[in-house]
Amino acid sequence: MKSLTWILGLWALAACFTPGESQRGPRGPYPPGPLAPPPPPCFPFGTGFVPPPHPPPYGPGRFPPPLSPPYGPGRIPPSPPPPYGPGRIQSHSLPPPYGPGYPQPPSQPRPYPPGPPFFPVNSPTDPALPTPAP
């Protein structure tokens, strides 16, 4: 078994230093001559010039003008509609289901007593039993 392990180890080591399938075949030569330089960037205002700065977005200042009131000058906006208008049902807040301090339902009595199951045993002296015939 050691010889099989030794052979497989040598085989794996040899595979590390031999060309794989992706390296087989002759490599083509590099393209003839040097590569062409990239095209120059396109400047619409001529080479060597910096584009003009963008105009400020809100005029001469840095901040936009204040917004005009949506209801005109001096007008008071209408009050919001009532939350429970006609046709709406007002939701009642329900009290907690088990009162305060109960994170779970209150414990109920056990449906059966603890301990081993109870098997009723009728004693032979029980008057409810029929007497055996002699």
UniProtKB/Swiss-Prot annotation:
Alphabetized InterPro entries for the sequence: SMR-like
Key word Zinc present: no
Secretion signal, residue range per the UniProt entry: 1-22
UniProt-annotated stretches for the region Disordered: 19-134
Biological process, per Gene Ontology: regulation of sensory perception of pain
GO cellular component: extracellular region
Residues spanning the membrane: none
Keywords: Repeat, Secreted, Signal
Compositionally biased spans, kind Pro residues: 28-43, 50-85, 94-119
Keyword Cytoplasm: no
Localization in the cell: Secreted
GO molecular-function terms, A-Z: endopeptidase inhibitor activity
Role summary: May play a role in protection or detoxification.
Family (UniProt): Belongs to the PROL1/PROL3 family.
The name this protein goes by in its record: Submaxillary gland androgen-regulated protein 3A
Organism: Homo sapiens
Native organism taxonomy: Eukaryota, Metazoa, Chordata, Craniata, Vertebrata
Gene that encodes it: SMR3A
